[in-house]
UniProtKB/Swiss-Prot annotation:
Biological process annotations from GO: translation
Presence of the UniProt keyword Ribonucleoprotein in the record: yes
UniProtKB keywords: Ribonucleoprotein, Ribosomal protein
GO cellular component terms, semicolon-separated: cytosolic large ribosomal subunit
NCBIfam families noted in UniProt: L12
Name of encoding gene: rplL
Xref: InterPro entries: Ribosomal_bL12 (IPR000206), Ribosomal_bL12_C (IPR013823), Ribosomal_bL12_C/ClpS-like (IPR014719), Ribosomal_bL12_oligo (IPR008932), Ribosomal_bL12_oligo_N_sf (IPR036235)
Protein name, as recorded: Large ribosomal subunit protein bL12
SS bond list: none
Subunit comment: Homodimer. Part of the ribosomal stalk of the 50S ribosomal subunit. Forms a multimeric L10(L12)X complex, where L10 forms an elongated spine to which 2 to 4 L12 dimers bind in a sequential fashion. Binds GTP-bound translation factors.
Lineage: superkingdom: Bacteria
Protein family membership: Belongs to the bacterial ribosomal protein bL12 family.
Organism this protein belongs to: Methylococcus capsulatus (strain ATCC 33009 / NCIMB 11132 / Bath)
Record function comment: Forms part of the ribosomal stalk which helps the ribosome interact with GTP-bound translation factors. Is thus essential for accurate translation.
HAMAP family (alphabetical): Ribosomal_bL12
Length: 125
């Protein structure tokens, strides 16, 4: 009498974790294979397709120009980053410069809006 896959799966689902570990060890010995090799291959195949589907979750705000009103842009940079006057001035004058890195889309859009209102040209990457 042949045992169906459903019967095997039902039996395994009723086993404890230790019994399953023993079963896997016995199968490795009987068939001369390693379960670790099969597990290591599966994530590689899944990982190869994942980057095409992944959505970007972290964004960088990059100021490309400070425009005509540098003082207002420096004030906005100080408010956003908490930098001192000299550091904020150096950041503004060193365009293109990264204002913030690894932030959410909403926060990046908020910072972009504040800087554009102050007169800066900003990209979210």
């Amino acid at each position: 009498m042949a045992v169906s896959k459903e019967d095997i799966l039902e039996t395994i689902s009723n086993m404890t974790v230790m019994e399953i570990v023993d079963l896997i060890s016995a199968m490795e010995e009987k068939f001369g294979v390693s379960a670790a090799a099969a597990v290591a291959v599966a994530p590689v195949a899944a990982g190869a397709a994942a980057p095409a589907v992944e959505e970007k979750t972290e964004f960088d705000v990059v100021m490309t120009s400070f425009g005509a009103n540098k003082v207002n842009v420096i004030k906005a940079i100080r408010e956003i980053t908490g930098l001192g006057l000299k550091e904020a001035k150096d950041l503004v004058e060193g365009v293109p410069s990264t204002v913030k890195e690894g932030i959410s889309k909403a926060e990046a859009d908020d910072i972009k809006k504040k800087l554009e209102e102050a007169g800066a040209a900003v990209d979210v990457k």
